[in-house]
UniProtKB/Swiss-Prot annotation:
Protein name, per record: Probable protein VP2
Biased composition (Pro residues): 48-60
Ranges of biased composition (kind: Basic residues): 221-242
Keywords for this protein: Phosphoprotein
Length: 265
């Protein structure tokens, strides 16, 4: 929806604005004196600056920090001013265009600068060819050149060969691989011997337990101890008495009893 001009005139707009400001003040403060409250704030805080009109002057310029001095041993660069384009002015630009014809552009780089630039280009190769201190230095030593700085920051080792940091020689890798292969071969042969020994060994015969009735519900581990079998005892010999004397005595007693009864009658 596009913007439309207000329906009230200037006096009506001021009245609406004043009432809206009073109502907004009453929404957060109950003093009831909007004008006095505003005057007290103006005395304490001062009048704020009005908003910057559109298209006005820009803000404060950003301060440019000066460039750091070049490190020792680094290639020297061509000094130029802040507003000067790269490669110098128009005359320098013309000299650079005529450098192929032997112009004055050759004076921009001195032989020392060219030598330093070539040293920087050969830095990766030089890093891999730098020997390692053996034994390592323990006392601090002042750094005098770039090569010495690289030599001091590189991790020391005792290997005799020269290689980049974090790599090993091909010969040492081959020896390590051969050692691992031998260990794997020994382990494989040992496992095969154990497997063959288990196959040749005869299994133990299983002993069948006799079936006993009434032991289906017996709890394991709580069996009654078996009693020892008793030795067979020989039967005792009984004494035999004579039956004839006993029978004769019994008959005599009975006859005496009968005779006594008859006499009494």
């Amino acid at each position: 929806m596009s913007w439309r001009p207000p329906a009230h005139n200037a006096e009506g707009q001021e009245g609406l604005w004043y009432r809206s400001v009073c109502q907004s003040h009453g929404a957060f403060c109950g003093c009831g004196d909007f004008v006095g409250h505003l005057n007290r704030l103006a005395e304490r805080l001062g009048r704020p600056q009005p908003p910057r009109p559109p298209g006005g002057p820009p803000g404060p310029a950003i301060r440019v920090l000066p460039a750091l001095p070049p490190a020792e041993g680094s290639p020297r660069r061509h000094n130029r001013t802040e507003n000067q384009p790269c490669g110098g002015g128009d005359a320098d630009f013309g000299d650079q265009r005529d450098a192929g014809d032997g112009g004055a552009a050759a004076d921009d780089l001195s032989p020392a600068d060219v030598e330093d630039l070539l040293d920087w280009l050969d830095a990766p190769d030089r890093l891999s060819k730098t020997p390692v201190n053996n034994p390592p230095l323990t006392s601090p030593v002042p750094v005098e050149s770039l090569v010495q700085y690289k030599l001091s920051t590189r991790s020391t080792s005792t290997r005799a060969s020269r290689s980049t940091d974090g790599t090993s020689d091909v010969a040492s890798l081959g020896r390590q691989l051969l050692k691992e292969c031998k260990q794997n071969q020994q382990m494989l042969s040992f496992l095969q011997q154990v497997q063959n020994a288990q196959e040749q060994r005869s299994p133990w015969p299983l002993q069948e337990t006799p079936y006993l009735p009434g032991r289906e519900n017996a709890k394991p581990g709580k069996t009654r101890p078996r009693k020892k079998p008793r030795a067979k005892q020989k039967p005792k010999k009984r004494r035999r008495y004579r039956s004839s004397s006993n029978s004769s005595s019994k008959s005599n007693d009975s006859s005496d009893a009968e005779s006594s009864t008859c006499s009494s009658n």
